[in-house]
Design a protein with these regions (language model features):
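Conserved non-transmembrane functional hotspots
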Residues: 2-147
Length: 147
């Protein structure tokens, strides 16, 4: 009986570790996508000024890695997190296909606000599921972690 309980605890611990790693990857990709949307919907002048900096700081995954992330999300992510992530990518898709249609101030602000809202919901869902808000770090008087 104790052996089975230990196996179950280990399986739960393993699943949590997989999920935490996956969620970090999903959040990184979602934030990178949001940054890219902001770049491609900018005016021609702004894009030209940002091009070099963007090329150095673009953290979007290559296609194969994105596919792996999506497959892992299908297996390990909760329906809520997977749904929010997929919604963010679906909102971004038309912008990626036709960025010129989203370069007016109104269209740009609308799509960036929508995707920022979804990203905020995604981050909140991940924090809830991982219990990140329940974790407290004890700090000493100098602000360093003491344990």
């Amino acid at each position: 009986m104790a052996y089975r309980l230990t196996l179950r605890r280990d399986a739960i611990r393993w699943l949590r570790a997989q999920r935490a790693q996956l969620y970090v990857g999903m959040l990184m990709q979602a934030r990178a996508q949001q940054f890219y949307l902001s770049f491609i919907t900018s005016s021609d002048t702004a894009r030209e000024q940002m091009r070099e900096v963007f090329a150095e700081t673009d953290t979007r995954l290559p296609p194969l890695e994105r596919a792996r992330l999506g497959a892992s999300g299908s297996v390990f992510a909760s329906p809520k997190v997977r749904g929010l992530y997929d919604l963010l990518m679906a909102e971004a898709w038309p912008v990626l296909l036709y960025p010129g249609r989203f370069r007016s101030d109104e269209a740009r602000m609308r799509v960036l606000a929508r995707t920022a809202g979804i990203l905020g919901e995604l981050e909140a869902a991940v924090r809830r599921e991982l219990g990140a808000d329940r974790m407290t770090l004890k700090t000493g008087p100098d602000g360093n972690n003491t344990g």
